[in-house]
Amino acid sequence: SLVASEFVTKIDELINFFKGTFYGYQYNDDFGFEYKVEDALKDVEKFGFLNIQGTELKATPLGRRVSELYLDPSAAFDLIQGLKKLTSDFEDIVLLHLISSNAEMYPWTNIQKKDYEWLEETTEELVDKIVTKAPKEWDYEYVEFLKKTKTAVLVRDWIMELNEDYLLENYNVPPGELRNKISTAEWLLYGASELCVLLGEMEKISGINKLKFRIKNGIKEELIPLVKLRGIGRVRARKLFNAGIKNVLGLRNVSTEKIAGLIGSEKVAQSIKKQVGHKRMTEADFENF
């Protein structure tokens, strides 16, 4: 971020900056201090975020965007590598596993003894689909991989509209931790969408943004048209959908009283009718809405 903002433009300026930090105060006398800074620069250059010409430092367009997104360079690089492997018609769980495996999602969801069997079965089902490397069960990274997989399944069940009580009982994840994971997943998907622009992966952006909206609201894809309206969350949307009111067309063509009866609020029902208009719609009208 120092280079991206042009606060420093040379290697010696960067080293002097770090010498003035608490880390520098502690380790400035360490023989390898400057080498550590230079090694970190080489890593960021390898990631494609930085150009080093002699002693001059300049962030690449991709590096500047990573800095603007407040992503850790290593985590951003891992995300980019996964996005490049992602197919345009990706399954939800594949992208969820990618972001759940990212270092920015740490700490991952803890696993209990009862989780191992179903997580191993889930891993077998996913191993040929996911874009992240799956370790062997005897590798030291295996338990961490299972934690990442559990995190991905947790978020998937959230967008499948399973409630917080179910997630607490089955995954031992309290509401506060769940909200933290949801928030981080949203942020990573926003970052993924923005990075796709610079990577030229435009065909993946729509699917990423749709999944981000679903995570924010905890809904299946079929509820998106309803939840886009003010005053309709996932509970009200599901009640409307189950009653056969599935979109703006359906809302326009039923009475305010029926909507109020379903969602339990006359005031919100009136607001919804104002948003969609009172005129009855045909299928052709709906397509042009």
Model-identified regions with their sequence ranges:
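C-terminal helicase lobe
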Residues: 1-42, 75
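Alpha-helical interaction/regulatory segments in DNA maintenance proteins
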Residues: 258-288
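C-terminal helical accessory/scaffold domains
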Residues: 38-40, 46-228
